[in-house]
Design a protein with these regions (language model features):
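Active-site helix/loop of acyl-thioester processing domains in fatty-acid/polyketide metabolism
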Residues: 127, 131-150
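N-terminal accessory segment detector
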Residues: 1-129, 154, 164, 178-179
């Protein structure tokens, strides 16, 4: 959080010692972040998180990068859906990239979309969680898209989330291309 220039007085108000395997503790920390930090600071912190940065998906994205290194970004984005579990990203007119992860239902929510986060699956219905939490998942996609596309990305926005819509809206993130 020092990179985000968050002062010590604010940091002291956050509980970093709580058991991170308990989703309620994580949710409390996220709520405190939302209360004390700017949206930009929250996104900057959360995009550094993300699970599943290794394994087969990592190998597949790095192989995709080698295979398509000579192609322009727009073509790479159009081909990304060929990589398993990497969705179908969309290159917006302003040069940002939007990723939608939806129509997945595993029973976490009653709507047509659900959260695939292992911690969230431990919670009992009904619940509503700040979309800031989803920055962690966005960090997962940011990592893999950077590797696959060969560009530096920054999380610009968490557009929607099933976590605060009871599954009515999908996970949707927008990334800014930095180079």
């Amino acid at each position: 959080m020092k990179k985000q220039k968050i002062n010590g007085e604010i940091m002291e108000q956050m509980d970093f010692e709580a058991d991170c395997n308990n989703p309620h503790n994580i949710i409390s920390l996220i709520d405190k972040m939302d209360e004390l930090l700017t949206q930009g600071q929250c996104l900057s912190i959360m995009e550094k998180q993300g699970c599943c940065k290794g394994g087969q998906r990592d190998k597949d994205c790095k192989a995709f990068a080698l295979e398509h290194a000579d192609k322009p970004l727009s073509e790479k984005i159009a081909l990304m859906s060929s990589v398993q579990y990497m969705m179908s990203p969309y290159l917006n007119d302003d040069g940002t990239i939007t990723v939608t992860f939806g129509d997945d239902q595993n029973g976490v929510h009653t709507g047509k979309n659900t959260c695939s986060c292992g911690s969230i699956k431990k919670l009992k219905q009904p619940f509503s969680i700040s979309p800031t939490y989803c920055g962690c998942c966005a960090g997962h996609f940011l990592y893999h898209y950077q590797n696959a596309l060969g560009v530096k990305l920054k999380l610009k926005e968490i557009n929607s989330s099933p976590l605060n819509t009871n599954g009515e809206k999908p996970c949707k993130f927008t990334f800014e291309v930095l180079d």
